[in-house]
């Protein structure tokens, strides 16, 4: 009788032990699963709050994506143009400038007739093209940069177009301590300032000059002269001594990244050799670079407004913002 009772108690304890063991394992398994699901769901929500994974497609309006964690206005069109074209106010002006004190409101209202939301058009002026390297950050859904074109400025126009239409990662260069080399075709030096006179001396593996004397700057080869902006290319994988006036010009070591697909360039030309294939009136090309042949700035803006669909459809709207230290003109 005692043995039977003992066996019964042992059996009950064994069953209880197995039950508790399995229950605790299941409890921990369920708890761990819920914790993992909670963490993953929060990560997904955070990533969606920081990055737009789907591009916005233009169908006549700038589409709206609301995102409280993103500092940029994602339903905007920024237009950059020279400050010099804003003229003195008054009727009967024939200089071709924007002489209307309410020009910004007028232009924005005309864009609204094309389907843009009220308040989505932002007009910004710049003083000189080198501002786009030094200070201007393009942060709208779409960005249009208007630059006057002339044969005398053809080189700088080509270089600013290369800069504006791509993303660049840059670091300051200390010319008093280091020699520098470019490591590939996407590695260039960006010079900007009031007067960038730059000369270089390539060095061999023993630090002797190749065709120049490192100790004599008069023997250096001139790569930039009397310019406000220059993208300097030298022979890759060769160290160079660099000579320039650091008080009037700054130099950055830059790597070209991806194309800035939400940005287009419009060159204003009065040249008789105008290339009509780039005109928005002729649908333009898919390079996000256009030309308008006009002298009057109201004519220029009227043309941009009328053909904004052609211009915008060549672009892709902003879908993410990158903030790593050293990036100039962050991809917006």
From Swiss-Prot:
- Entry comment on modification after translation: N-glycosylated. Intramolecular disulfide bonds.
What keywords is this UniProt entry annotated with? Calcium, Capsid protein, Disulfide bond, Glycoprotein, Host endoplasmic reticulum, Host-virus interaction, Metal-binding, Outer capsid protein, Signal, T=13 icosahedral capsid protein, Virion
Q: Which Pfam families match?
A: VP7 (PF00434)
Q: In terms of one coarse class, where is the protein primarily found?
A: virion
Q: Where does this protein reside within or beyond the cell?
A: Virion; Host endoplasmic reticulum lumen
Q: Which residues form the signal peptide?
A: 1-49
Cellular compartments per GO CC: host cell endoplasmic reticulum lumen; T=13 icosahedral viral capsid; viral outer capsid
Q: Which GO terms describe its molecular function?
A: metal ion binding
Subunit info? Answer: Homotrimer; disulfide-linked. 2 Ca(2+) ions bound at each subunit interface in the trimer hold the trimer together. Interacts with the intermediate capsid protein VP6. Interacts with the outer capsid protein VP5*.
The protein's role, per its UniProt record: Calcium-binding protein that interacts with rotavirus cell receptors once the initial attachment by VP4 has been achieved. Rotavirus attachment and entry into the host cell probably involves multiple sequential contacts between the outer capsid proteins VP4 and VP7, and the cell receptors. Following entry into the host cell, low intracellular or intravesicular Ca(2+) concentration probably causes the calcium-stabilized VP7 trimers to dissociate from the virion. This step is probably necessary for the membrane-disrupting entry step and the release of VP4, which is locked onto the virion by VP7.
Which family does the entry's similarity section mention? Belongs to the rotavirus VP7 family.
Its protein name is Outer capsid glycoprotein VP7
- Give the source lineage, highest ranks first: Viruses, Riboviria, Orthornavirae, Duplornaviricota, Resentoviricetes
């Amino acid at each position: 009788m005692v043995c039977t009772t003992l066996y019964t108690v042992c059996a009950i304890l064994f069953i209880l032990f197995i039950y508790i063991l399995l229950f605790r394992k299941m409890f921990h398994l369920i708890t761990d699963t819920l914790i993992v699901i909670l963490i993953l769901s929060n990560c997904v929500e955070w990533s969606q709050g920081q990055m737009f994974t789907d591009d916005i497609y233009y169908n006549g309006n700038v589409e709206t994506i609301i995102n409280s964690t993103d500092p940029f206005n994602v339903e905007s069109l920024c237009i950059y143009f020279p400050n010099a074209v804003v003229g003195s106010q008054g009727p009967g002006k024939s200089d071709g400038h924007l002489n209307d004190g309410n020009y910004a409101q007028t232009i924005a209202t005309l864009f609204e007739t094309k389907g843009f939301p009220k308040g989505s058009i932002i007009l910004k002026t710049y003083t000189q093209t080198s501002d786009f390297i030094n200070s201007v950050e393009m942060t709208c859904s779409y960005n249009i940069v208007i630059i006057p074109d002339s044969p005398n400025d053809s080189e700088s126009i080509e270089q600013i177009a290369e800069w504006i239409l791509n993303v660049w990662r840059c670091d300051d260069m200390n010319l008093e301590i280091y020699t520098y080399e470019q490591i590939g075709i996407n590695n260039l030096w960006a010079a900007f300032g009031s007067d960038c006179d730059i000369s270089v001396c390539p060095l061999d593996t023993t630090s002797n000059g190749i065709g120049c004397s490192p100790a004599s700057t008069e023997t250096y080869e001139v790569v930039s002269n009397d310019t406000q902006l220059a993208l300097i290319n030298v022979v890759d994988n060769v160290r160079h001594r660099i000579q320039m006036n650091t008080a009037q010009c700054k130099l950055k070591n830059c790597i070209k990244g991806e194309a800035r697909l939400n940005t287009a360039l419009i060159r204003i030309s009065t040249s008789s050799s105008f290339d009509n294939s780039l005109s928005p009136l002729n649908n333009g090309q898919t390079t996000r670079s256009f030309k308008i042949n006009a002298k009057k700035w109201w004519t220029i803006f009227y043309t941009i407004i009328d053909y904004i669909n052609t211009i915008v459809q060549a672009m892709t709207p902003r879908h993410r913002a990158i903030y790593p230290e050293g990036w100039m003109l962050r991809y917006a």
